[in-house]
């Protein structure tokens, strides 16, 4: 599965020697999509694919840090994912909880700053609490900036931004002209 998720420029195992240095992007964004279909194509349950994808996120973070990539964004759960079968949503939330338990260790090891974007209000309280804890604990880290998009969708983001702007206009905080 590693080759399935590994971008071509990460295939080189080492760039420690000066003559092997390569140009790397400053920011990589990854949409965690297709893990369920991948598992199904292998005769495994969809949740197995989601779990394998989550395991690879830690590897990707370490590789990005090692290569000097400054920003990594992972689209982990979109607003559209709520329409999946409830047992799959529950499994994804369990996976998120488990990942967040180990995420702090990975962040400390790789000097990662963790930030979560998206509408976290519908998430369970324990997940929201863990998000706040991770963001606060890693706020001063200077290595890889790791952004996790949870309950995120571009339409939803634009809708929330437009509503906030309208409220700010009504409150007199912003001039509509």
Q: What are the roles of these predicted feature ranges?
A:
Residues 4-177:
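Flexible, compositionally biased loop and terminal segments
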């Amino acid at each position: 599965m590693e080759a399935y998720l590994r971008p071509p420029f990460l295939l080189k195992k080492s760039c420690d020697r000066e003559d092997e240095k390569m140009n790397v992007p400053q920011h990589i964004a990854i949409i965690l999509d297709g893990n369920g279909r991948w598992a199904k194509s292998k005769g495994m349950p969809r949740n197995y694919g989601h779990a394998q994808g989550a395991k690879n996120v830690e590897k990707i973070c370490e590789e990005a840090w090692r290569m000097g990539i400054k920003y990594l964004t992972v689209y982990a759960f979109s607003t559209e994912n709520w329409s999946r079968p409830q047992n799959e949503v529950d499994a994804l939330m369990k996976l998120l909880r488990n990942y967040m338990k180990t995420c702090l260790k990975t962040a400390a090891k790789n000097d990662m700053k963790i930030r979560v974007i998206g509408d976290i209000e519908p998430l369970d309280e324990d997940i929201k609490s863990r998000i706040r804890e991770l963001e606060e604990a890693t706020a001063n880290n200077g290595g890889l900036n790791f952004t996790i998009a949870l309950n995120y969708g571009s339409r939803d983001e634009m809708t929330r931004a437009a509503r906030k702007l309208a409220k700010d206009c009504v409150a007199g905080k912003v001039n509509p002209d």
